[in-house]
Amino acid sequence: MINVGAFVASARSGARVVVGGDARGPVVSAARLGMKERLFAFLAHVPLLKHCDAVRRYAEQVRMENRRSLEVFVLALSKRYGPEGAKAAFDYGARRDGAPLDQRRVRNMVSIAEHFHGTGDAKPLARQMVFRSWECRGLDHPGHASLTIKNQADADAGRHVYEHVSWWPNQRLGSKEHFDRIEPKTLDGYRIDKRSEISSATEQRLREGDAARRKILADGFKYANQDERHDALFFPRAGQKLDKDAEWGLSARKVYFPAIGFNHDRRDTDRPRAFVLFGLNEAAMLRDARTVKEGAKSGELKYRMISKKENCASMALRVLRAGGAEHFVPYTAAWISEDPNHAHAYALAVQARIDALNQRRADVERRCERLHDSASVRQAWRAFSEAGGASASPLAEDAGRGRASAHMRQARLDEHAREVERIGAYFAELSAGRSGKHRDRADADLADAMKRCAPSARDDVAALTRKASVLVETLGRHLDAPPPSDSSALRRLAAHAMIGRIEAFMAAAIAA
């Protein structure tokens, strides 16, 4: 099966993409652009010559190739991003019939499909936060923003968490009430948000169009009257679809964030749970989300459409920031009023930073594993590890599940603090002989990071996130070059072990 990557790779040449094939199946490639093709392409734009049989046949052949390429490309997008993302890419990206599928169009259609599918590596995770927004196009179409906290990690579905924060006015706003503080209401789910973001007139036309097409399909086109034929032309746009209750709604732009702590891919339950070091604090977000809802019930909080703190976008951002978004990207408030577009841009920036750090963390893990290929390094590191015997995993698992007693938790924290000191001393011992001309900038940066980023039981989530990001990025740069000696490889393994201690303290911090 042809995938999206094949189209992206073929489009890099700048030529239009075509789909050919043989008995083995379809093949994507860049169209040949020789002297003949260049000549016919030129003649197809000359008024006196474009109607010649040879030129017309060439132009029709190109149009057919472009249509076939587009059909296969949309199918590939559907396989990767789902039918909704592929439909959006077709609606917004393939505007002219028979237009060439070139690098710009491939890039735009992939971008549109990704947008409707959702952005972020956390989408398949069991513990995630979803920031949703509908585009703001002025006061008449203000859009919306909401946030959902999901936790489906427990095998018992009754213990799953679904907390949705969606801030709305409790009454329909008039044209002069944009600055008024009025009573708020909160909606309980994304499905209700979707229904609220489609106008009654649009919903009516969608129903009429669907009914007309069904009638024409059943009775035949020739029996349809003019009104039915007209209604049948009104198709749903990208994002407009029926839910399982047969209600029309408009899908949002989605940005996915991982929750800090143990997590797993819902698509592959056989894989062991892995610790996510960089993410948002689920417990803190749940507390703030419930505070917001209580404030709506008590009347302490109000809704004001043009506001930095009391509209839908500002409330969604409030809960996002409560989870530690500013540990990754500083937040800058809007000058006059928050809006879904500004909120979406900030959410994207936070998601990109979190995903980049987690990818860097995984890359560091893989590279440090390869350091064990050296027998001497493996033996030396085993000797050091066995001398300590402490492990971060039991603490992290127990802290994350809330099963460890306070006494046991403190004992484990003390054990990890001793291990931090031992790793630091081992790193200093390995570095003792390297000074002056034998110590390069990378060594100095790593030594400084190890000194500044040693975790402790006093660190909160913000401090641990800051230390982890500095150490991961510094070690990642250090690993770009192969270690010149065994001591250099062991220093890198010591730094990697320190990241493991940060994970252990992080697990305790989010469980506190």
UniProtKB/Swiss-Prot annotation:
SUPFAM superfamilies linked to this entry: Non-globular alpha+beta subunits of globular proteins
Highest taxon of the lineage: Bacteria
Tagged with keyword Coiled coil: yes
Major location category of this protein: secreted
Compartments (UniProt record): Secreted
UniProt cross-references to InterPro entries, sorted A to Z: Globular_prot_asu/bsu, SptP_N, SptP_N_sf
One Pfam family matching this protein: SicP-binding
Entry keywords, A to Z: Coiled coil, Secreted, Virulence
Coiled-coil regions listed: 347-376
Protein function: Plays a role in mediating bacterial evasion from the host autophagic pathway.
Family (UniProt): Belongs to the BopA/IcsB family.
Protein name, per record: Effector protein BopA
